[in-house]
Amino acid sequence: MATLLYRIGRFAFRKAWYVVAAWVLVLGALLGTGLALGGQTQESFTIPGTESQQTIDKLENLFPSAAGAAATVVIVAPDGQSVNDDTVKQEISDVADDLGNLDQVAAVVSPYSEYATNAISEDGTTALLKVQFDGPATDVTDATLTQVTTAGDTLDADGMTVAYGGEVFSNQTFGLTITEGIGVLFAGIVLFITFGSLLAAGLPLLSALIGVGVSFAGITLVAAFTSVSSTAPMLAIMIGLAVGIDYALFILSRHRSQLARGMDAEESAAQSVATAGAAVVFAGLTVIIALLGLLVVGIPFLSVMGVAAAFAVFAAVTIAITLLPAIMGISKGKLAPKPGSRAARRAIAAASHDDEKTDAATPASPASVTSPSAGAAEIESGAPAKPAESANPAESAKPTKPTKPSLGGRWVRLVMKAPIVFIVAVVGLLGVASIPAFSLDLNLPTAASQPEGDSSRIAYDTIADKFGPGYNGTIVVVADITQTTDIQNDLAGIRSDLEAVDGVATVGPGLPDETLDTAIFQVVPTTAPDAPETKALVERLRDMKGEVEAQYGTPFTVSGQTAVAIDVSNQLSNALIPFGILVIGLSILLLAMVFRSIAVPIKAALGFALSVGASFGVTVAVFQNGLFADLLGVHSTGPIISFLPILLMAILFGLAMDYEVFLVSGMREEYVKTKDARRAVRVGFQHGARVVTAAALIMFFVFFAFVPEGEGAIKAIALALAVGVFVDAFLVRMTLVPAIMTLLGKHAWYLPKWLGRILPNVDVEGESLREHIEEREWARRHDGAVTAEDLAVEGSGAPVSFDIPAGSVAVITGETAARRLIGAAVAGRIAPDAGHLQVLGHCLPSESGPVAKRVTLVDLESRRPDATTTVGDALNERLRLGLPWFRRVPQGDTEELIGRINGALAGIEGETPIDIHRTLGELTPLTQSLLAVALGVADRSDVLVVDAGDGDFAHPSTPAFAGAVASIADRSTTVIIGLESEPASHASTVGDRALVRIALPGADPGDADLSSSSPTASKGGPR
């Protein structure tokens, strides 16, 4: 992965303006389309298959008007007047008539209608006007809602107070607010303190804002076609903004650190994306996987939220590894810390420390690579060294004063002195913070969670005050009356039984449908929809189903807002533990792959559980119990939104793994180099502490900004995430982790051998990139077409070295299996197991893709020609592969290849010329082989590798084979031929082309002295 990211970073740097233009086009297209279609969110929480949802679905068929969306117009008479006054009554009735004439309105029930039930408050000051739409809330247009409010607002002019409630008025068109600005402001302050540069501080903000724009536009577009919760876009923006800034911070820190140490800007950008970017991709993928894991829960609205947030994270990751290096390419070396600055001194000191660790006698090259944790090097501790890209050489030579030990260094030393004390303190503190979580009460959001002053909140509060809290959440009982013979009396009896249930305020009369199959009862509880007593009432109503059915023969189901909330909460509660096991299990597996350890992932998972518990506890204490509610701008307390626990686990999991990787990867790198466990903890912590601190503070401020200024359910989610990030970063990762790692010592890095063989090796630390850069530097020192040094492929025998100049002919002799393996490695088809190998300037195996495109491999032993195919057809088919589908193969190309074959056959005893009409079955084995070579030549590759296998034509009795192959290939093509043994006369058959002889260990070198005929001939090859 690191090598792929290295190439992406280098490409983005070189093609900076193209990459920037591409992102501008993507953002513009999404924004333009999304805003043109005008997506709208809604508070719709349903779970297919639950009793409440099945009841709603049934009502849609039997009572279409009752199943449609509803709105309540709450009208309060002017002071000193009553809604029963003739003037007020007439005005309200006129508005009801106007509403009834609107499109999409199925029915309007005036508070004075005979069908109205308890629509006027006891004190006569408030009336409820019911508006029933002909479809679900998603179908009600903005134009219709505007017409409803316009008609109702005419009462305001007459001194009445009007508010609008119901699901349709909980829908929200969303947009960016001051909340995001507050988070960005705090993030900018942290970034400026971290980098000490406005330009550097602005880049993470810019990339994050572009990511937020892309995700915002995408969700707006999707909301125009499907139901999207109003929480989803704000959650996506909040997550996208936080991770977007953090991911850019990690990569940019690495880049500035390398620039300060003198690395070329392009190389630095590529390596930053490859190392820190690899950790970013890993962290982003864990968040995305966890969020997409919400799909398995089977709750549509939660799935949409998970996908929306995952898309925001995907956008943040993609921008960090593409757009950010492009901006680095535009900025060139301007992002380097100023020579002599604190950032420069720290970065240089970290480089000096790394050199001291590895080999004091070997100077660090500009292409040296460190782990992603060193991305924070510029903001760690250090000593003076040469600054990067200094315009004034004398300035570079100025002595710089050493920096004091960093706060992170002092902190980790303190923790390591008394690890048990810190472990007990952290676990005890987080355990106490988790206690309120045991009283966690889950429910769906109601209008009570809307901001004060919002119309739906005013309507909700007015109804609760004037009619009773239960009127905001009517329970619907749907009875099947197909088996009753006395409908009227049975419905009256059921109503009486329902009224007798504890917690019921009133019950409306049973209303049968037109076919007398089903009847509905409106049950008004005495308590609010989200009250525990109302939940208990729903359960009591459901418990009496058997009794009612036995007495009246009428089975019934229970639905309504509270019933839906109970079903949703139950479904979420049932999914919470399996999902938690899945998330924690995933974390253990992923970290075991990354760190090659058992203890590290188990410790990380336990720390994650502590963070989640503390986050739950604090959220319950504030939003449910009211602790510090006023201080935090929480204006109403009550149950926690049902999907918060599972959503928090998904998001916090990824963020926790993010910090774990950046801290512990440095520890692992140090331990691998020194085998000193205590030193590894100290040095690794110092490498990553400052950047993790900055990242955690940014996330905390971004999330926390949504608490006092956010809307609805997002406030609780924001607080939970803010607390979770703070606890996980500062108490768990930066205190508990070094304490536990100190106690475990070298046992922290133990991994059973059998498990190590099973687990894939995730190269987050960039080890493959180090190897790639070393191989690339080695390849640049050799100008031959193919060069190998101590090359070994499993099954090929002892290592071999050789150097094949461009345009020469090389003959490899040895066992067939060994030759074929070496040939396949040269062609980029298989990876070498050891040694160095370069082909046409590309190092293998990391650049096997370009090599495979420029090298043709012809394995004669594996050929299976169709005896009935003609020579012309075989050549035309191969030549056609290299042409566009609409072009024909020029006849001259086919004739040219046949001419080359005949030229090679000329003078070979027993061989005759061929033409396009000869079938392959009519050809001799040697001619068939030369035709196969010609098919390979048709690819016009720079290197042609031919292995003769065990064919008779490869016997020394056919000495002209090498010359025949060489004459078919272009003179500029480097030809490598594999034979069992090489006759002496091969040297003369290749003409004036250089001949290189390579004898694999154990091969018969032949009886020729090739030194006089081949100026580059070698055995083993030059080094």
Regions found by a protein language model. Give the residues of each.
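Structured non-transmembrane domains adjacent to transmembrane bundles in polytopic membrane proteins
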Residues: 49-70, 79-166, 439-629
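Membrane-embedded transmembrane helical bundles of large multi-pass transporters/channels
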Residues: 1-39, 105, 136-440, 553, ...
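Conserved catalytic loops of ABC-family nucleotide-binding domains
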Residues: 286, 940, 951-988
